[in-house]
Amino acid sequence: MFSLNPQSNGNSNNLFGNVTLGNFSNNSNNLFGGSSTTSTNTNNSNNLFGGSSTTNSNNLFGSGGSSTTNNNNFNSNFNNNNIKNENKIKNGKKFYNFRWSPTGEILLYNTLNNFDNHNFDQKNGGSDTIRYEMNTTLSTIKKFYNDLYTNFETMQRIAGLSNQVIPDDRVREISHHSRTYLSVILAAINQMSKSQKTGSYIDDEDSCMNCDPLDNDLIKIQTPRVLEYFKQYPNKTLIFFCGSIDSIYPYLCSKLSMETKSKCILIARESNVPNSKRLDLIRTISNQGELKILNKDEYSNRYQIANENYGELDDVLTLEIDDTYLAYEREIDNLICMSTMWRVANLFYFSVSSSSNSVSPTQLLDCIELERKELLNSIEQQGTQDPMDSEYYNQIARLLVCGCIDQVIQQLNILSRAPRSASQIKSTSRKSPINLLIDILSSIPLKKKSINGGGGAPLYPNEHLIQWNKWHQETQKILSQYIESGSSSTNQVDENLLPIVKILLGDQQTIMSTCNSFLQLVVSNILFVEYTTSTTQLRQLFTQCYQTIQAPTTVDKIFLSFATKDLDITLKKIFKHSPAWLAVHLSDLLYHHPYVMRKLPNSESQLTNIREYLLSDFGQSLASDSSLLSIGCNYLKYVKNGGLEMIDQFISRQPIHFEKNAIKMLDKWATSVETKNSIYKMLSLQDFKRKRYAASLNWLMLANDNSHITLLSNYLLENQLNSEFLNDLQSLLEKNDEIDCNINNNNNNNNNNNSNNRISGNNNNNMIIDENKFEITNNSELIFLIRYRELISLWKERSFKEYSSSLCLMFKDRVIPKRFWLRLLIDCVPLLESLKNLYFTYQDTLLLQSCLEEIIQSHLFDQYSFNISNQDIQILRSALARNLAKSIIS
C-alpha cells in the first residue's frame, strides 16, 4: 500500500543531480545548484544561483584570483545518506554538489557586490575584498574585544541622539569614553598579567583544555622553537615551566633532552581531567628525567618552589615554554604599547583640558605610567643595593627622569644615613647636598598638587605656571651655589650626585643620556627644563625632542604624528603597525570630536572616509573568526557603504552546526531575503543528512523555494514514504497553523479560495516567515504529498468511504503524477472487490477506468508500469468491471 517506487531513469528530475564517480551527467536538476565536474562544466544543468564552477576555477567574487575545489563534489558527508537507495534507483542519489570558500566553508551563492580594492581617500570610504582569515584568538582578547565594543556602541548611540549637541558637551562625552577605553585596556593588561603569573590561563584558554599531549602536528610545529633553547644553553640545567601536564611540552622537552643529552627539569600543573593514558605518559616522562607536577596553588608560586628545590644547583636557568604563556606575553606587550599611544592621543585630543589648550604635568606622567611601573618593579626585583655603589645613584637618576619623585626622596633618605654621606661637605645653608636635594624635591609643585588639590583645578589660570617658575628659580639658585662651593680648593662636588644635580638644573645632555624613551625625554624637559601648560608649546617640545633622537622607532614616529596634527597619517601608521582595534576606536572618537578635522563643529568630519574604511576592515577581520562573528557583524552594521551586504556574506558562509545558532543568526543578522534563504537551505541540508525529511521540507518551505520543494517532494514520494516520515509530515503540517489540508488542487481553475492558502506559521523554533510566504498551490508535488498523507491516514483509520472519495477527487483534479496512477489504482482493488460495501459509485468507477486506459495508452507506459505485472493490470480491469456492474445494480 505504501510503496510508490517506480524506477527512476537517466532523464528524470533527480533530486540530487545524476552523479557518477567522476562526472555529473547531463539533463540533471541539482537540488541546491552548482553543478560541476572534475574538469568541465555539465551541460543543461539547472543551477539555481546562476554561474558554475570547475575544479580549477572557482572565483569567489568574480574578479581576480581563483580557488581550487579539488573534486569538491565528493567531499560532502551528505552523500552517505543515500547508499541504501542506490540499489533501488538506477542513478546514484547525491544530495548536493558543494562549492567551497577559501577556508573550506560552504559557499552557496556568488557575492552580491564586488568589493574592489579601496584606499583611504575614496569618496565613499569603501572596503577591501572580503577576507576569510581564521585566527586563533585568546579568550581574554575576545572578552577585551567585547568590552571595547560595548563602549563603542554607547558612543554611537549617544552620537545618534542629536546632531545639534553643544560642542563642549560632546567634548566631555568623548573625554569620558576615552578614559573608559583606557580603563578597558589597562584592565586587560592587569587580568592577563595576573593569569600569566598564577597560571590560571590554563583554565581559561581553549588551547590548554582537552589538549592531546601526543599531538604530532603541534609537536612538529613547536619542536624547532624548543630545540633552540637546548642549543642556546648547552651547559646549563634548564628548568622548563610547561603549563598543563596535558600539553605537549612535558613529552616534547623530555624527548629533546634525551636526543641532545642535555639536563632539564620539567615543572607542570596537574591535569584537569586525568586518565590512564596520561598517567602512562607521565610515568614514561618521569623515567626519562625529572618531572615535578604541582597543583593549582603551587603552580602559581612555581618560581618560589623552583628556587627552594633547585636553587643550590649551578648554572640553572628557568624558562616558560608554554606557547599560550608566550602568547599572553606578546599580547601584554602589545597592550602596554597601545595604552601609551592612547594616553598620548588623549593628551592632545580627548582630555577636557586639551580643548582649552592646556595640559598638566600629571597628564604627561600618565603617558609613562607603565614605564614607571616597570622601572619600579625591576628595582624591587634587584633588591636593596649598596648605597656606596655608583649603580645606586644611576638608579636614582632613572627614577628622577621618570617623575618618580617620592621614590627618589626615599632613596636619598637611605643614602643620607650612609656613613659616607654624613661626612659630606655642607652648603651655605649648612645642609648636606643630599638633604638639599631632598628639600628641593619635596617642594616640587608636582607633589604640592597631589597633596593640596588632588588633581583639582587651580585657583586662578596661571597658578601652576607661577608655582613651577618659582620652583625652577629656587632650584637653580640653591644648586648653583652648591656647585660653586664645590669648585673651591677645600670642597669637592660628589661625582655620583652630579648627574642628579644636572638633571634638576635642566642639563639636556645629562637628561638625554639618562632617558630610555622618547616620552621620558619629553617629561624630563617639562619637569626640569621649561615647564609649560600650553598644548601648542607641548607640540613644539615633542618635535624638538624627536629631532634629538638618533634612531627613532616607529612608535616614536606615531607619538610625533599625534603632536603634528597629521591625523590621517597618524591613523594610517597605527593601522599599519598596530592592532586594528586601536586605529578603529581612535578614529571613531576623532570622527565624533566637534573641534578635530572639521571646518565647523557641526560640519562633516574629514575623517569620515578613513573611519569607514577602518570599521569595514576591522569588522571583516573579526567576522572571519567564527568565534568573533557576532562582534564583527556588530561593527560592520555601522559601515554605511556596504556594511549590511558584508554581514550577509559572512552570515551566509558560516558553517551551521546547530539549529539554535542558525536561528540566532537569522534573527539578529540576516537582513536580505537571499541570505535568509541560503541559511534555510543549509538547515535543510543538515536535516536531510539526519533523515529528518519533514523538517528538511519545512526549511525549503520557509525559503519559498518551489523548485527544490518539487525535487525533494518527488524524492520523498519515490524513496521515503514510510510511516515515520508521514508522522513527521503530519507534525509539520500541524505546526503551520494556516495550512488547509483539504486543498482544492485544480490549479487550472484559478480558485480564489485555494490561491489564498499559504504557509505562514512558525517552525519548530517559532521563527516567523516574513513577507516571502510560500504558496502551497504553486507546488503540485507538495500538494500531492500532503493529500497522499491524508489517504494513508484514512486507510489506517479504515475510513474506506472517505478514502475512495478523496482518491477519486485527486484523480479528477489531476493532482496525482501519472507515474503513481497504476500503483494507486491497484491499491484500490480490495475496495473494488468488497462484497459488503460499495465504495466507488458509478461515476467514480468510470473515472478510474478512464484513468487506467489513459495510462495504458501512454507512450511512457513501460516506465509507469515498472515492477507491475500484466496480471496485476488484468486483475484491476476485472475489479473495475465488477464494481461498475455492482454500482449499476445498487
From Swiss-Prot:
Keyword field contains Cytoplasm: no
One of the GO biological process terms: positive regulation of DNA-templated transcription
Keyword Repeat tagged: yes
Disulfide bonds: none
Location(s) in or outside the cell: Nucleus, Nuclear pore complex; Nucleus membrane
First and last residues of every Sequence repeat: 16-17, 32-33, 49-50, 61-62, 618-619
Keyword set, alphabetical order: Coiled coil, Membrane, mRNA transport, Nuclear pore complex, Nucleus, Protein transport, Repeat, Translocation, Transport
Compositional bias ranges of the Low complexity kind: 59-84
GO molecular function: structural constituent of nuclear pore
GO cellular component labels: nuclear membrane; nuclear pore outer ring
TM regions (residue ranges): none
Sequence segments annotated as region (Disordered): 59-86
InterPro entries: Nucleoporin_Nup85
Coiled-coil positions: 719-752
Domain notes: Contains FG repeats.
Function as written in the Swiss-Prot or TrEMBL entry: Component of the nuclear pore complex, a complex required for the trafficking across the nuclear membrane.
Subunit structure: Component of the nuclear pore complex (NPC). NPC constitutes the exclusive means of nucleocytoplasmic transport. NPCs allow the passive diffusion of ions and small molecules and the active, nuclear transport receptor-mediated bidirectional transport of macromolecules such as proteins, RNAs, ribonucleoparticles (RNPs), and ribosomal subunits across the nuclear envelope. Due to its 8-fold rotational symmetry, all subunits are present with 8 copies or multiples thereof.
PANTHER family named among the record's database cross-references: FROUNT PROTEIN-RELATED, NUCLEAR PORE COMPLEX PROTEIN NUP85
The family this protein is said to belong to: Belongs to the nucleoporin Nup85 family.
Name the UniProt record assigns to this protein: Nuclear pore complex protein nup85
Organism from which the protein derives: Dictyostelium discoideum (Social amoeba)
Gene: nup85
